[in-house]
């Protein structure tokens, strides 16, 4: 069987934020999956920055506790040596292994790091025909990841695939001024107008 793993950039469930109320559920598909399949909480080693270290722990099973303060293994040890990972293990049993990410390949030295962890291919934004960006203009929208993921399956019709997908559409900064006209999702429980605008932007990007 094919295996898909999706890392949702800067994701959190708004229902878990005690002070925040949203007019309707911005992530109904997530909640449906959570209700009907195995689910749980994930402890991550970073907050506010450092997505690559969450990736590293998830892909390798190694804890960031054993690395230096502020270290990014993608930019240090993986420039010197290979590292076993989910990708290398699955390759041993015949899987083709891929990464799809709609941001730059050299950010966090990902191009090198994924190669060192045993991935066969890495499709970064440089290899995509990106035409749509988030409302703040900073990041490609995530919908392109669907077609790019399907391409990884189509490229290896006689193999099972492991495709690791990294989104970017919910990445900060979150604008303090309103940038979405007539947002589908609106928030309450936030008194500061700038923070309210930021939360409104965030929950709309989650969807």
Residue ranges and their predicted role:
Residues 1, 5-8, 12-207:
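Solvent-exposed soluble domains appended to multi-pass membrane proteins
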């Amino acid at each position: 069987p094919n295996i898909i793993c999706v890392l949702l950039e800067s994701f959190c469930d708004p229902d878990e934020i005690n002070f925040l109320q949203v007019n309707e559920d911005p992530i109904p598909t997530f909640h449906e999956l959570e209700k009907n399949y195995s689910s749980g909480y994930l402890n991550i080693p970073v907050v506010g920055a450092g997505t690559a270290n969450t990736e590293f722990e998830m892909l390798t099973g190694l804890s960031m506790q054993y690395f230096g303060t502020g270290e990014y293994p993608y930019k240090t040890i993986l420039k010197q040596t290979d590292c076993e990972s989910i990708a290398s293990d699955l390759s041993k049993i015949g899987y083709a292994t891929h990464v799809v990410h709609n941001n730059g390949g050299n950010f966090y030295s990902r191009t090198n790091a994924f190669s060192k962890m045993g991935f066969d291919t890495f499709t970064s934004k440089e290899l995509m025909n990106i035409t749509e960006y988030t409302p703040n203009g900073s990041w490609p929208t995530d919908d392109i990841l669907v077609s790019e993921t399907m391409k990884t399956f189509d490229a290896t019709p006689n193999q099972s695939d492991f495709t690791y997908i990294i989104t970017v559409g919910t990445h900060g900064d979150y604008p303090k001024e309103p940038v979405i006209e007539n947002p589908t999702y609106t928030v309450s429980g936030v008194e500061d107008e700038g923070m309210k605008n930021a939360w409104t932007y965030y929950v709309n990007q989650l969807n």
